[in-house]
Amino acid sequence: MAPDISCFFLVALFLASCRATTSSDQKCIEKEVNKTYNCENLGLNEIPGTLPNSTECLEFSFNVLPTIQNTTFSRLINLTFLDLTRCQIYWIHEDTFQSQHRLDTLVLTANPLIFMAETALSGPKALKHLFFIQTGISSIDFIPLHNQKTLESLYLGSNHISSIKLPKGFPTEKLKVLDFQNNAIHYLSKEDMSSLQQATNLSLNLNGNDIAGIELGAFDSAVFQSLNFGGTQNLLVIFKGLKNSTIQSLWLGTFEDMDDEDISPAVFEGLCEMSVESINLQKHYFFNISSNTFHCFSGLQELDLTATHLSELPSGLVGLSTLKKLVLSANKFENLCQISASNFPSLTHLSIKGNTKRLELGTGCLENLENLRELDLSHDDIETSDCCNLQLRNLSHLQSLNLSYNEPLSLKTEAFKECPQLELLDLAFTRLKVKDAQSPFQNLHLLKVLNLSHSLLDISSEQLFDGLPALQHLNLQGNHFPKGNIQKTNSLQTLGRLEILVLSFCDLSSIDQHAFTSLKMMNHVDLSHNRLTSSSIEALSHLKGIYLNLASNRISIILPSLLPILSQQRTINLRQNPLDCTCSNIYFLEWYKENMQKLEDTEDTLCENPPLLRGVRLSDVTLSCSMAAVGIFFLIVFLLVFAILLIFAVKYFLRWKYQHI
């Protein structure tokens, strides 16, 4: 009875009143104090007076500004970035940006422009990036650009422009990007291209224009960083038209909704009279490939043949011996040996990702690629009972291997012995079966990144990660520890150089306070989406300055003794936890408000208890934890009763003692 009465009095003693201060007013979000503001989609028809004059970056898209003039932004003289996407702008009057001398980037995307004054852009002296995408213009002459000598990129996609000819006096000396994708350009003349002569290493995007003709000599001696003719059906026109040009990257891919046309070897003859380092031919149809199909590709460094319906490459291909990077993704190979790897002795990067048929790795199919550094075989339905030394024979210089999203792989001891130089190994979403007690990774002394997420790996073995002295990043997301606990002795203890540890979605319920003691270099720990309570925070007491993600756990009350551990971290995420917002958690709530700069996703860090404050942001809660009147009353009653009982007890004791003298 006595304990029950005591509890009752203690509850009454600490009855508290709670209140939440919230604001429902829509206003711009401050991203950087006095400098960067987001006012998107607020239905505004003018610049809010609350924005300081010191504003430098303003995101103002999805508002309503039918007309802008010289008074619209006049006081924001420090603007360097202005986004006016979909603001229903029709008219841009004289000297609209006359006060914005420092304006660097102007975005006018998706505004139905009718009029733009000749002096509309006369103010900015350092304008570098202009976006006129989907504005309905039919000619570049619509934009007054004659004074923009600092312009580096101009985006004009999704309009009705039929010629790329730039206006007379258009400054191109510093122009690096000119984007005309999805317009109505079908012919390129010498006159068109002559207006680009002053631009060096330009990236010209004509994707989605279906070029039907190029005047002979239009690209003579031209030098481009990149050219994009994506969606053009007649590749013969392109290769003939680019004669005598020099191009770093040439993009000639097509789209899925276009009719497949066979590419004959004659199409590529024009390549013999131009210089190209990288070509993308994705989604074209190669019906028959002979040994001479690529004979004009002799200087090529990179070739992308994604989704080109290939099921086999013949041996003895001419012209690809110097190729460094080859992409054969989304094709129809059944066995890795069908790519005839001996055709590419200089290859350093190979990607066969998302093969449309189950890919058999075979034995030694890539052994001629002794210079290979990166290999991507993800999403290929690969399955093998003995991975991976026979399959990766002679790849001693391989540094990156991606086998993610495949079928079950069985790993023996030193499963990657043929690849001792590996620095990155990705086995995510591939079920792994470790056959031996010893680690399958133990010879990978240079491995820095290991992704084992959702691999259904048995993590109970303490030797699982032996032999990985250089490992810095380990992702174990979606794997389960025995009984949902990480014990003092565990498989992670040998990873002394680990910096990033991901243990999200691991169904963890507890972590021993000494589980991570040997992991002294960690700076990023993700424990989100588990069943952890605040007691597991003790396991991080030896770490300082880390990013700590505790989102979506079962943390309710954080005791005062744990607050110093949180205080010494760089960034903390506590969103979607059932946080207690009563006086029982008052010390944490006070700490939370004092350390907002450390906290991430504060908009989703909400109270769960008491019901009155459920769904309220912690930052908006103010508790008054002083003793309530009813508490004082019960305290007085309790003290009076206690005093009376004490008096009677003393009196009884003295009487008993007197009687027994």
From Swiss-Prot:
LRR repeats: 54-75, 78-99, 102-123, 126-147, 150-171, 174-195, 201-221, 275-296, 299-321, 322-343, 346-366, 371-391, 397-418, 421-442, 446-466, 470-493, 497-518, 521-544, 546-566
Membrane topology category: Single-pass type I membrane protein
GO cellular component: mitotic spindle; nucleolus; nucleoplasm; plasma membrane
Glycosylation sites: 34, 53, 70, 78, 201, 244, 288, 394, 402, 451
Tissue: B-lymphocytes and spleen. Not detected in thymus, kidney, muscle, heart, brain or liver.
Domain LRRCT: 577-627
Keyword terms of this UniProt record: Cell membrane, Glycoprotein, Immunity, Inflammatory response, Innate immunity, Leucine-rich repeat, Membrane, Receptor, Repeat, Signal, Transmembrane, Transmembrane helix
Subcellular location, record wording: Cell membrane
Cytoplasmic side: 651-661
UniProt cross-references to InterPro entries, sorted A to Z: Cys-rich_flank_reg_C, Leu-rich_rpt, Leu-rich_rpt_typical-subtyp, LRR_11, LRR_dom_sf
TM stretches of this protein: 627-650
Record flagged with keyword Membrane: yes
Top-level taxon of origin: Eukaryota
SMART domains per the UniProt record, alphabetical: LRR_TYP, LRRCT
Extracellular-side segments: 21-626
Pfam families in the cross-refs: LRR_11, LRR_8
Keyword Membrane: yes
PANTHER family: TOLL-LIKE RECEPTOR (PTHR24365), TOLL-LIKE RECEPTOR 4 (PTHR24365:SF521)
Family, similarity comment: Belongs to the Toll-like receptor family.
Purpose of the protein: May cooperate with MD-1 and TLR4 to mediate the innate immune response to bacterial lipopolysaccharide (LPS) in B-cells. Leads to NF-kappa-B activation. Also involved in the life/death decision of B-cells.
Quaternary data: M-shaped tetramer of two CD180-LY86 heterodimers.
Name of the protein this chain belongs to: CD180 antigen
Organism, scientific name: Mus musculus (Mouse)
Lineage: Eukaryota, Metazoa, Chordata, Craniata, Vertebrata
